[in-house]
Amino acid sequence: LRLICDLIVSNNDEVVMIGPVWPNIRSSILLKKGSIKEISLELKNGEWVIDFDLLLNSVTAKTKMVFVNSPGNPTGWVMPKEQQKLLLNHTRHLGCWLISDEVYHQITFNDFVSPSFLELSKPNDRLIVINSASKSFNMTGWRIGWITHPEELGSHIAKLVQITTTGVPEFLQNGLGSALENHKTITYELRKNLKKSRDIMFNKLVNWNQVECSIPDAAFYAFFKVKGINDSLDFAKKLILETNVGVAPGVAFGASGEGHLRICFAAKDTFIIEIMDRLEPALNK
């Protein structure tokens, strides 16, 4: 993501993005002095939804780049294929870049994979799709990812890689090679375990008085509104002192995340049960 922002974004370039979103993308845009126009997801009837007409109308001739993270961190929201098609057609017509972060593409609970813009793309589209081994293969921290991009960008990306990461160490390449050879087994087991952990967590959350939430169809986060709080960072600090459980404050994911908390459920069942038992007195008053 940082490489792409270095390549595309410059002073005052307008970037349209959907929030709440992983904070590093916002930081990468601001480091290049880009201007962010954020369209916020809304929680309606237990589902995260976007005002899609508002999104399309926000992407104009002034827009340099549109950023989509689907499935999304922190919400688990997935952009439907029909919306992907309409958005891609819109950016194609305007000639702006569409960046799709699809690192949770295989972490889904109702389908084998989530919809990808690559299924709709044409060779000359100004489309860049980002993926990673971190989520699908439990290789977080190995910093192995890949970019699907138009041929014209190849030499420019290579130059940026040369002065940043240079290359992937051989033993990490071997690990990824093994993961790719066994990807069906690995991702099947991962999804099965994550779904079990998700269900344990949300069987509690949906019944807590102070919590309003959506059960995610993808990724591995619970992102929920806590009724009555307007400073999620302060509340998260208090939770650590009261329960010894660390959660991510929603404001870290942008202004639209304020009043929410995020918990990762990529953990063993016994661990999930323990943290929910600790959190219940604070969130189910």
Over which residues does each language-model region extend?
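PLP-dependent class I/II
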Residues: 1-285
